[in-house]
Curated annotation (Swiss-Prot):
This is Phosphoribosylamine--glycine ligase. Keywords: ATP-binding, Ligase, Magnesium, Manganese, Metal-binding, Nucleotide-binding, Purine biosynthesis. Pathway: Purine metabolism; IMP biosynthesis via de novo pathway; N(1)-(5-phospho-D-ribosyl)glycinamide from 5-phospho-alpha-D-ribose 1-diphosphate: step 2/2. The keyword Manganese applies. ATP binds at residues 135-196. Gene3D superfamilies: 3.40.50.20, ATP-grasp fold, A domain, ATP-grasp fold, B domain, Phosphoribosylglycinamide synthetase, C-terminal domain. It catalyses: 5-phospho-beta-D-ribosylamine + glycine + ATP = N(1)-(5-phospho-beta-D-ribosyl)glycinamide + ADP + phosphate + H(+).
């Protein structure tokens, strides 16, 4: 069968790499893909942008694609799934209506409130004065979020009132996040430890994926501004069996049932970003309507199940007949980014020292890369690569991941040197 993966990031390289391992699959196309997918013998890039739905659809029809897997959020919120389904094509992802769970933070917070799903206390604002009054009433620390899609960067955790007021002005008057900031959500600052809880949903049944923990801040020790994610590991020890059960009962099931009841039946990957308090109670920080990036990379390295088989079952509403199998070992991925990220950075720099052959139990996934005409690999984004490895402990996986990237460099490249620190601290105690 033929599979199409939509996207060009590290997540899509990992999903396509995993899909190509399925015995059901003959060819995997990636639209538009990156240098990493271009260099994989089993994958084929197609030069179509992720939001060019007519071109994606006509390619899928022309090539008789049997299954499409959507990586990023942008095509989901503009209805790629609706278009493919209307044409009778199998596609794994939520409809435009269901993708509002990620596309609008205000929609999500109101949905959570309607269904009594645990989350931070909040209010939505479109005007500066009431927003500032609310800030002064609540005090800092406090969280300000742009309503729409801002590539994971539209969230300001303000530790002082001045910082909070500046963020409100910036988002509502200064238009720091384009259309995404015309409405903001202000919510209470939650204390605890974060985890990424990702499941597959077929509208009615749910199949949990491996848990993971992302590192959002750009700097070591979780300092500096938020990014799309600087590294991740799986499983996340903070998600104990008890926390897992609470998350399914209090968050995942009520969300799936609530969406169906409101006429937005949810199919696709559903990613709950959780904050887990000292008592092991999870609250929703955010929902994403797709697999996380960089969480996908370590999770796919651990996945023993056939990803394509699971996606097909989900498209047919038969996820209850499937289980997922995972490597017992831990997996850890470190993002190598371009100097200046998450601010402005240069592109087109040549990347040196990429591993020339496959490594056992490790893989360097490509994100912001492109292949030059002379086959040199160049940078094309802020997050460029993700060096990922398995290990019997998180500490061992960390050591192996960093070893994979020893020789990789380009002008200004950088990474955090402490990915996995929370889990390693637990292992040592």
């Amino acid at each position: 069968m033929k599979v199409l993966v939509i996207g060009n990031g590290g997540r899509e390289h990992a999903l396509a790499w995993k899909a190509a391992q399925s015995p059901l699959v003959d060819t995997v196309f990636v639209a538009p893909g990156n240098a990493g997918t271009a260099l994989e013998p089993a994958l084929q890039n197609v030069a179509i942008g992720v939001t060019d739905i007519p071109a994606l659809l006509s390619f899928a029809q022309h090539e008789k694609i049997d299954l499409t897997i959507v990586g990023p959020e942008a095509p989901l919120v503009i209805g790629v799934v609706d278009a493919f389904r209307a044409a009778g094509l199998k596609i794994f992802g939520p409809t435009e209506g269901a993708a509002q769970l990620e596309g609008s933070k205000a929609f999500t917070k109101d949905f959570l409130a309607r269904h009594q799903i645990p989350t931070a206390e909040y209010q939505n604002f479109t005007e500066i004065e009431p927003a500032l009054a609310y800030l002064r009433e609540k005090g800092a620390p406090i969280v300000i979020k742009a309503d729409g899609l801002a590539a994971g960067k539209g969230v300001i955790v303000a530790m002082t009132l001045e910082e909070a007021e500046a963020a409100v002005h910036d988002m509502l008057a200064g238009n720091a996040f384009g259309d995404a900031g015309h409405r903001i959500v202000i919510e209470e600052f939650l204390d605890g430890e974060e985890a990424s809880f990702i499941v597959m949903v077929d509208g009615e049944h749910v199949l949990p994926m491996a848990t993971s923990q992302d590192h959002k801040r750009v700097g070591n020790g979780d300092t500096g501004p938020n990014t799309g994610g600087m590294g991740a590991y799986s499983p996340a020890p903070v998600v104990t069996d008890e926390v897992h059960q609470r998350t399914m009962e209090r968050i995942i099931w009520p969300t799936v049932k609530g969406m169906a009841a409101e006429g937005n039946t949810y199919t696709g990957f559903l990613y709950a970003g959780l904050m887990i308090d000292k008592q092991g109670n999870p609250k929703v920080i955010e929902f994403n309507c797709r697999f996380g990036d960089p969480e996908t990379q370590p999770i796919m390295l651990r996945m023993k199940s056939d990803l394509v088989d699971l996606c097909l079952a989900a498209c047919d509403g038969k996820l209850d007949e499937k289980t997922s199998e995972w490597d017992e070992r831990a997996s850890l991925g470190v993002v190598i980014a371009a100097g200046g990220y998450p601010g402005s950075y240069s592109t087109g720099d040549e990347i040196h020292g990429l591993p020339l052959e496959e490594v056992a139990d490790g893989k360097v996934f490509h994100a912001g890369t492109k292949l030059a005409d002379d086959d040199r690999v160049l940078t094309s984004g802020g997050r460029v690569l993700c060096a990922t490895a398995l290990g019997h402990t998180v500490a061992e996986a960390q050591k192996r991941a960093y070893a994979l990237m020893t020789d990789i460099r380009w002008d200004g490249s950088f990474s955090r040197n402490d990915i996995g620190w929370r889990a390693i601290e637990r292992e040592q105690n």
